[in-house]
Structures are given as structure tokens and as C-alpha cells.
From Swiss-Prot:
The gene is TPI1. Substrate binds at residues 10, 12. GO terms for cellular component: cell surface; cytoplasm; cytosol; fungal biofilm matrix; fungal-type cell wall; hyphal cell wall. Keywords: Cytoplasm, Gluconeogenesis, Glycolysis, Isomerase. This is Triosephosphate isomerase. It comes from Candida albicans (strain SC5314 / ATCC MYA-2876) (Yeast). Has antigenic properties. Critical for growth. One of its GO terms (biological process) is gluconeogenesis. Its main location: cytoplasm. SUPFAM superfamilies: Triosephosphate isomerase (TIM). The lineage of its organism: Eukaryota, Fungi, Dikarya, Ascomycota, Saccharomycotina. The keyword Cytoplasm applies. Belongs to the triosephosphate isomerase family. One of its GO terms (molecular function) is triose-phosphate isomerase activity.
Length: 248
């Protein structure tokens, strides 16, 4: 089946008010394809600014993180209801930097994912293996474990987009070959078919992330199981528009 092409931009802990405004102004001026869904995730401090500045109907705003409970005494956290309150509609969960640096577990990420969905926030769920795990031949085992934590407590995946990000390729300049990505995505979809059912698995979009840029994005064009990209550093640059247009 044809799944709508999806491009996410994760700004990480980058940007100032002026830079965020400039990035969004560049998107506003671009002739973006009407059939490509775009979500940009600025730092939490700039979510409201991004919502106000964005004029593109195909571009939505997302958070980079969300807590697994409603608002309360959780210093430093971002609640799902607050994401919606400022006009954003998506959040990332499970990014490898939070798994490794913040030590978030599969189970905690699953709880955050479920709470966001239950609150009405759509989720880009990040999964992926380290270089050691890849060399050990357990890429799909790792991805399956990370996915299973979520599928155990979430049955409806209609508002989840999966982002496969091999940890060794994030911000390193190294990227999985299109063939490697397609093979892994195919395996991820096959696993999802077992855990959430073939129909949902077929509809779930699976993005590739890991040193995607304006030049290599086109190389993935004919890969049937690569439904888009989650872009890091390049989302801060004008070439982000080229990535959005890479299926044209």
C-alpha cells in the first residue's frame, strides 16, 4: 500500500529565537509538496514560537520529549497536555541520545509513548542499535525488544510513526546504505506484523534516521519500506527542503 511520505526534523538542543525563526521562514517560503507530511521538533523553549511562525499547512510542530504522567511535581519535564496547549501535536520518544545519555529504559519509553497517545499527542518512536550490536548481528533483535515494550501496552498504532536510527550513524556522517536500511525496515515491519497485526504493520510508516542530508536522501527513493526520514543536523539547514522534496 502507499504510505504518505513523512519527514521529521529533530533540532536537538540547537538554535536561538533568531535561528528558529530563520529556519521556519525558509520553510514558509519553500514550495513544499502537498503530499509530504513534515514535523519539526525544536527545543521545548521554542515550541510556542515555532507554532506561531509556521505558515505551512503540511508542517506540524513536535516536542523532543514528553513525560509519562500528567502535569505535577516533575521538575524539568514536559507534559503531553502542555505540548497540545501551545499548539504542537507530536513528540519524539525513545531517541538514542535519551536512551544512552539519560538512561531511559525501554519500559519508560513505552509508558511515555502510551501516555502521549492517550492524551492526544502523536508519536515518532525512535529505535535502533549500537555499532557493537550491529557487528554482533543482533540489529533486529534490539529493534524488536524496543518495539515490544510499546506493543505490550499500546494496541492502536495509527498515531505512531517508527523511526529506525542506527546509533552508529547519528551525527557521525556515516549512513546505512539504502539497501541496508530497506532490509532492516522490512524486518521491522515483519516483526510488527506479528506483534500488532499485519494490517497495522502495513500502515505504519517507518522512517530512516542517521546522517541523512540533501544529497543522500534521493538514494532511498525506490526503497518500498523506507517511508521517510528523521533528520538531525540537516534539519537546521536550507537542505532540509531538499530532503522534503527528495521523492519528487
Amino acid at each position: 500500500m502507499a504510505r504518505q511520505f513523512f519527514v521529521g526534523g529533530n533540532f536537538k538542543a540547537n538554535g536561538t529565537k533568531q535561528q528558529i525563526t530563520s529556519i521556519i521562514d525558509n520553510l514558509n517560503k519553500a514550495d513544499l509538496p502537498k503530499d509530504v507530511e513534515v514535523v519539526i521538533c525544536p527545543p521545548a523553549l521554542y515550541l510556542g514560537l515555532a507554532v506561531e511562525q509556521n505558515k505551512q499547512p503540511t508542517v506540524a510542530i513536535g516536542a523532543q520529549n514528553v513525560f509519562d504522567k500528567s502535569c505535577g511535581a516533575f521538575t524539568g519535564e514536559t507534559c503531553a497536555s502542555q505540548i497540545l496547549d501551545v499548539g504542537a501535536s507530536w513528540t519524539l520518544t525513545g531517541h538514542s541520545e535519551r536512551r544512552t545519555i539519560i538512561k531511559e529504559s525501554d519500559e519508560f519509553i513505552a509508558e511515555k509513548t502510551k501516555f502521549a497517545l492517550d492524551t492526544g499527542v502523536k508519536v515518532i518512536l525512535c529505535i535502533g542499535e549500537t555499532l557493537e550490536e550491529r557487528k554482533g548481528g543482533v540489529t533486529l533483535d534490539v529493534c524488536a525488544r524496543q518495539l515490544d515494550a510499546v506493543s505490550k501496552i499500546v494496541s492502536d498504532w495509527s498515531n505512531i510513526v517508527v523511526a529506525y536510527e542506527p546509533v552508529w550513524a547519528i551525527g557521525t556522517g556515516l549512513a546505512a546504505t539504502p539497501e541496508d536500511a530497506e532490509e532492516t525496515h522490512k524486518g521491522i515491519r515483519a516483526h510488527l506484523a506479528k506483534s500488532i497485526g499485519a494490517e497495522q504493520a502495513e500502515k505504519t510508516r517507518i522512517l530512516y534516521g542517521g546522517s541523512v542530508n540533501g544529497k543522500n536522501a534521493k538514494d532511498f527513493k525506490d526503497k518500498a519500506n523506507v517511508d521517510g526520514f528523521l533528520v538531525g543536523g540537516a534539519s537546521l539547514k536550507p537542505e532540509f527542503v531538499d530532503i522534503i522534496k527528495s521523492r519528487l
